[in-house]
Every structure is written in structure tokens, then in C-alpha cells.
């Protein structure tokens, strides 16, 4: 259906991403630092775990996508997961920050693996249907862009709020004091997350008409194999997520050891998210209407590339100029992250256009699979660079470690944003082509419905 969605529906949908990020953003902002500086897990072990478990999460996404595509209830295909999958997710979001500090190092690592894997699986079983829900709510391009913008703003505001709430609490705190801080906030956020998921469930409806029966796994996979725009978008998303999570995982180390002021952590997160994504997300629907989704992505990727390169060079002599450069990079990255959701939704119709099979869950899960791989690679790169450069927790760092941190937070994201630009430059699904596809699909559905009506009558 091509109707415009109300702002109440769009806001209600975005609250689901606030809840998502109560679990997700906590990990992105604080988990590596928690493992190394509080729980006593070695940097190399933590980096390896973050990489391997994120790869596990990626495969969990594919499993979740298949589960979602096989479900059909009176609440729809996607909304039931928001109702019944949230409690396990929120429980694991608490457990990952509850590593017993008096255990041996090996036992801590095993506990971290098990709880982080549990968090990843539960997150997949909620986030895959949540993301797929947007494709079932509307086929109207501007509404899809608004849904993407709303969830982008919601996610970024959540990042900023968590940084402001928790960042000052761990400033100059001992590891023992930080344990209590993390325990308190994870419990509070778990309860709030379950409430927000329920509001999201009540605020949304699945409106897109489905004619065909549930396809077999083989047919679903054949549909995916023919979807070239989806694969190109996945590679572009992989690069953007590597860039994003390299910055997130490096930020606390950057302010602590390069700037020597953990109080600047909230400023850094504010620039990255509020100034970046929240400033850029409202612009995306207008940009999409004027120049299309592909060109909007390209502009964002180019801004990100230039901003991160500038950030690397100026950060050694002027913090204010460095923050301006980071804001430019973050705006570009915010544009790409926001428009990415609308591009993914379009690939569902492209697959349906080619094969007659509509597989929202598996399509989104493949997209999320590559995003998780990007998160794994991006989140682990700083840990590996720290380990290779000789990082020792809670000590004055060597020049090699300082350069490693600066590389992780600037040059790594710069390179991957440039690669994303190159890949999407060749992306074939333009807005004009998408409109033609939607018209063709609607015409096919009308013919099918007429045939069904003629047979039954």
C-alpha cells in the first residue's frame, strides 16, 4: 500500500529503535572498555571475542530471518516478535555487564562469550522483525524515508543520552565503583526497553498486501541470489558499519589516553550522534525527494571520507577544529546510515519484481548479516590495534599506542567510507526504476486478485 504514514505511527515505530539501542548502544559505547578496564579481560581476548561473536550474530540474523518469514499470526508476521522476544533480550543486556570479577581470566572469557552470544541471538530475533516491519507498513518512498530518518534520530538520541547519563558516572571512577554503575543502569534500561517495545507494537500495523504463500527455503535463496542491488547495498553497508563501530569502540580510549580527559567523552558522543545523525536525519527525506536515495548516500559517504581525513590531521593541534571535522564526518555518516534503511526496503520489491516472491525477513536478515559483520570488524579493529601497539590498561600510553588510537578513530573510518562511496556509485536501483517496479507489482496483484475472485465466484 502506498498511503502516507501518520507521525504518530512513525514516532511509535522509532521507539522500537530506542529500545533496541538500550541493549545495542550500551555494547557499542562501553562494552570493550568494561571488559578490559573493569572485568579484567585482556584486550586481545576481548577483541577476538567481539569479532567471533559478531560473526555468530550475523549467522543468527539469517536464522532469525527464516524464522520470521515462516511466521504468520493474527498480529501479523513481524509485530509478535516485539511482544514476546523482548524479555530475553533485555535480560541478556544486563548479564553481559555482570562478569564475576573474582573469577579466573579463563572463566571470565567463557562467561563473556556465552552471555554475549545469548545477547546476539535474542537481539536478532527482535531486531530482524523490527527492521522488516518497515517494508510491511508502506511502499510509499517518502514514508519509508521518514521511517528511516525517525529510527536514525531515535538511535542517535539514545547514544547521546546514554553517554550523558553513564559517561559522567564512570569519570575518574575506580573499577569497583564502575561495576555498580553498570549494574544499576543496565537494569533500569532493561525495564524501560520492554515498555518501549510494547508501545512500538501497539503503534504499528502491517499494511502491505501479500498474495503469494510462504516460499520454500530453496525458492527464497534463489530469490536472494538474483537480487544484485541487495548484494551491492550489503557491501556498502558493511563498509559504513566498519567505519561507524571503529569510531564508537575507539572513543573512550581516545578521550582517556589521547586527550587525557574522560569528561570529553560525552562531548565526543554528542558531536558524533546529536550534531551528526540527528542533524542530518531530518534532511534525508528532502534530499531523497530532490536527488534520489542513491545520490543522497553518495553525498553522505563523500562527506564522511573528507571529514575523517581532516579529523586525523587537525586533531594533533586544535581540538575545536578537530570537533568540527568530526561533526562533518558524522553528518555524512548519518546521511548514509539513515538512507540505508530506505534502500534496503526497496530491494524487497526488486526481488518480488524479479521472481514474484516477497521475502522481507530473509532480505532484511542478509542486510543485517553484513551489518553485523561490519560491527564485528569495526568493533574489533581498535582492540587488535591496541594489542599490537602495546596497550596496557589504566597506564600512561606510549606514542605507538597513541598513534594506534588515532588511526582507529580516524583513518580506519575514512578508508571504509571511501570504499562505500565507490561501491554505491555503481548501485543500479534508481528511484525512477523503483517507481516502475512498484507499479508493475501492484498491477500483478490486481490481476491475481481478479483471477481469485473469478474462480471463487
From Swiss-Prot:
The keyword Transmembrane applies. Induction: In the presence of glucuronides. PROSITE patterns: NA_GALACTOSIDE_SYMP. Residues 1-11, 61-79, 130-146, 202-228, 285-296, 344-372, 430-457 are cytoplasmic. Keywords: Cell inner membrane, Cell membrane, Membrane, Sugar transport, Symport, Transmembrane, Transmembrane helix, Transport. The keyword Transmembrane helix applies. InterPro entries: MFS_2 (IPR039672), MFS_trans_sf (IPR036259), Na/Gal_symport (IPR001927), Na/Gal_symport_CS (IPR018043). Residues 35-37, 101-108, 168-180, 250-263, 317-320, 394-408 are periplasmic. It is a multi-pass membrane protein. It holds the Pfam family MFS_2. GO terms for biological process: carbohydrate transport; sodium ion transport. GO terms for cellular component: plasma membrane. It comes from the Bacteria. The chain crosses the membrane at residues 12-34, 38-60, 80-100, 109-129, 147-167, 181-201, 229-249, 264-284, 297-316, 321-343, 373-393, 409-429. One of its GO terms (molecular function) is symporter activity. PANTHER family: 2,3-DIHYDROXYPROPANE-1-SULFONATE EXPORTER-RELATED, MAJOR FACILITATOR SUPERFAMILY DOMAIN-CONTAINING PROTEIN. In some K12 strains, the protein is inactive for transport, probably due to a mutation at position 100. Responsible for the transport of glucuronide into the cell energized by the proton motive force (probably by symport). Import is enhanced by UidC (GusC, AC Q47706). Belongs to the sodium:galactoside symporter (TC 2.A.2) family. This is Glucuronide carrier protein. It comes from Escherichia coli (strain K12). The gene is uidB.
